[in-house]
Amino acid sequence: MVVSFVSICGLLLIFNLPLSTSFPVLSDTDVDVLEAILHKLEESMSEETEEDQMVPANSESLEPVGSMKQTANRDQIRPVEVEAIREFLSANTRKNVQNDSSRRSSSCFGRRMDRIGSMSSLGCNTVGKYNPK
């Protein structure tokens, strides 16, 4: 009795083993459906590539995006614009020189600690606003 029960359980396990895998066995109808879908996809992709490859016959008559007049106008810079550019750049350089964050720090603690140290004479650079040397 025990042997027949074990053999029946073993046979059931063997028959159900393919169903428990992560890749189930497909029937013929499933394979046929997948092949039909694949053929439809290939046909639609080939039609799209043919449409993309078609070039219009009047491609020679098309004008370039930038005409010659536009490029010539871009190349000519008025003297007023040159002067404005120079003024802007000189203002930027003045701002960079005057700006505290753009100056290099010579202290051993960094900019913020240097400011605190100069006010309280606790940093490496003790020469400051309230503590003249």
Swiss-Prot record:
* InterPro entries referenced in this protein's UniProt entry, alphabetically: Natr_peptide, Natr_peptide_CS, Natriuretic_peptide, Natriuretic_peptide_brain
**Could you name the domain of life of the organism this protein comes from?**
Eukaryota
Keyword vocabulary terms for this entry: Disulfide bond, Hormone, Secreted, Signal, Vasoactive
Q: Which Pfam families match?
A: ANP (PF00212)
Q: Its GO CC terms?
A: cytoplasm; extracellular space
Question: Which intervals carry biased composition (Acidic residues)?
Answer: 44-53
Query: Which N-terminal residues, if any, form the signal peptide?
Result: 1-22
Residue numbers spanned by region Disordered: 44-76, 93-112
Biological process terms from the Gene Ontology for this record are: blood vessel diameter maintenance; cGMP biosynthetic process; cGMP-mediated signaling; negative regulation of systemic arterial blood pressure; neuropeptide signaling pathway; receptor guanylyl cyclase signaling pathway
Give the disulfide map: 108-124
Q: Name one GO molecular function term.
A: hormone activity
> What are the subcellular locations of this protein?
Secreted
PROSITE patterns with a match to the protein in the record: NATRIURETIC_PEPTIDE (PS00263)
Q: What does this protein do?
A: Cardiac hormone which may function as a paracrine antifibrotic factor in the heart. Also plays a key role in cardiovascular homeostasis through natriuresis, diuresis, vasorelaxation, and inhibition of renin and aldosterone secretion. Has a cGMP-stimulating activity.
Family the UniProt entry places it in: Belongs to the natriuretic peptide family.
Protein name (record): Brain natriuretic peptide
